[in-house]
């Protein structure tokens, strides 16, 4: 037998949906593991089934044929070594996971159990330990692996020798070509390089000198600018001095006009005195022209002419004296003013410099004030924009909060509804547990009847003859993924995938949230509303409303067809004691009425022998 591949990979979805036999994958992620080629039909392939949720089964009805070595999560049946028997994968149903029960586990077959053989189970079977065929197959696998490892090592050694030969050839080629390698003479470029370096140094020095000259010129320009500002400030100082002297000149002109007015008034007064004196003289002269001569002996009179002349001289002397005093006062005042102007020149220059500096300071402060005002306006605008933006964001956050509060209220309402539904389901679960207990008691009594009547070995592994029971023994496998609960009775493996409840009867496994099975071999389907089977061999109804029968075929999952997959294939549960159940995401296929496992049972075929049914309890 040749092995084509050894691969193991996990895929999120592979193959068709939770279907029946033949190695089709499921849609909830699968582990594909195959040693060799898979086969859907019967035959002699012992390392054959591909796996996945809905793992492969070999659905031939004939006798003989090898058991499946590869398995699935919830694996299927392969064909046994004798009629109706099937071999388990990795130690039978007691190692099952992701849906034990009848046919569950990593290929948990009808020969399951650590001590089960062909037909091992509740009623015992014929011989066989856990892995007689597995040991043989492991030897073959190890021999194949050893041969492949030896060929791989030979290939590696051959490649290393080829690599050494290539390295040797490369070294020989370099040794032959090494003498022909010559170096070019670049000495005639050295002078050119030196000339270029000298030119670079010269240009660098010139550039630095030009930079220094530019700096000096810039400093000289700054000095001339300062001198220009000083020269521009000097005419301003001279203009201020001229304005001050103009005021002094105006004051002097005012005093001169006052003196002229006084001079005019005194001149008019003098003229008036002369006129009055002349009139008096004329009057006196007229008196002297009369005929009367009066002689009076008096003292000699004063000469009026002389008196007037004296007075005239006195006034003229007074006027000249006043004029000289005024001129001297004017000259002294002008001298003092000129002296003051001469002394206040440096002080005026200092004051003008201070004034110019203060003007510059005022200009700088005005510029800074404008800058601060511009910055203030920009900051106010930015503040307004920020307020508007954050107000918008705050409004959005408030709207989101209101939406979240509405969603929270909705979630709370849904939670209340779910709590009510949970209470209802809990009451249903309690009622179903009571029914399961009743079924268990009935089944125990029926089993005692079978043992006493010698009806044959009732194995949930492979029975002989017409007893094609589903997998499972005293130690029926437990599947415990996705909240599955534990199995119940003698070998009743717990399916328990996706919230499955506990299995009930001799091998009845549950899957996908289904209710409990109720017959000797009837596994429970029953996810999402599936009804439980109630007879000796009646298969349970599948998921999503599969119907139940008393010996007929069970409805499949997802709208149940007659098989186990999505509306799946044909084989439902038979009507015999060992009739396997359809049900969960497609049961694995057995050779004759094997039960569909969890997550991967295929279709089953009806068994050949049937017995009476036990009435279903409500």
Swiss-Prot record:
Tell me the superkingdom of the source: Eukaryota
Listed A to Z, the keywords are: Coiled coil, Intermediate filament, Keratin, Phosphoprotein
**What Gene Ontology terms describe what this protein does at the molecular function level?**
structural constituent of cytoskeleton
Chain spans, region Coil 1B: 193-284
Any single Gene Ontology cellular-component annotation: perinuclear region of cytoplasm
Region entry Coil 1A, spans: 138-173
Region: Disordered; residue ranges are 1-49, 449-618
Q: What protein am I looking at?
A: Keratin, type I cytoskeletal 9
Q: Which organism is it from?
A: Rattus norvegicus (Rat)
The organism that produces this protein has a lineage beginning with: Eukaryota, Metazoa, Chordata, Craniata, Vertebrata
